[in-house]
Amino acid sequence: MIKLNFSRELRLLTPAQFKYVFEQPLRASTPEITILARRNDLQYPRLGLTVAKKHLKRAHERNRVKRLCRESFRLLQHELPNYDFVIVAKHGIGKLDNPTFTAILSKLWQRHIRLAKKSLSN
């Protein structure tokens, strides 16, 4: 049975881990959200989130975005390549409703899966 947990080991925790992804990322983006990715040496993907107060003033709005991102990652973690992912929220993300937001995330995850397969074949 596949475990769909989101434990501590599946998260990017330190500034150095985030910096590693920001140095040479693969990007998939929409006007509201960007997912950056970079290959890691582990056997599983990891996730980091950046949601600035500049784009979402209220804490409950930032928490909603982070919760939806974590849930999306948790459900797809076994399909994703062994990359470190950083989700960057941009202006206008707060205006999206939950179904639209999850659809956008799903599309971006699929794009990263395709990019990873393409880079493996090269």
UniProtKB/Swiss-Prot annotation:
GO CC annotations, alphabetized: ribonuclease P complex
A GO MF label: 3'-tRNA processing endoribonuclease activity
Keyword presence, Ribosomal protein: no
GO terms under biological process: tRNA 5'-leader removal
Enzyme class, UniProt record, top EC level: hydrolase
Tree of life domain: Bacteria
Record's catalysed reaction(s): Endonucleolytic cleavage of RNA, removing 5'-extranucleotides from tRNA precursor
Alphabetized UniProt keyword annotations: Endonuclease, Hydrolase, Nuclease, RNA-binding, tRNA processing
Classification via SUPFAM superfamilies: Ribosomal protein S5 domain 2-like
Enzyme Commission number: 3.1.26.5
Quaternary structure and partners: Consists of a catalytic RNA component (M1 or rnpB) and a protein subunit.
Family stated for the protein in its record: Belongs to the RnpA family.
Function in brief: RNaseP catalyzes the removal of the 5'-leader sequence from pre-tRNA to produce the mature 5'-terminus. It can also cleave other RNA substrates such as 4.5S RNA. The protein component plays an auxiliary but essential role in vivo by binding to the 5'-leader sequence and broadening the substrate specificity of the ribozyme.
Protein name (record): Ribonuclease P protein component
Organism whose genome encodes this protein: Mannheimia succiniciproducens (strain KCTC 0769BP / MBEL55E)
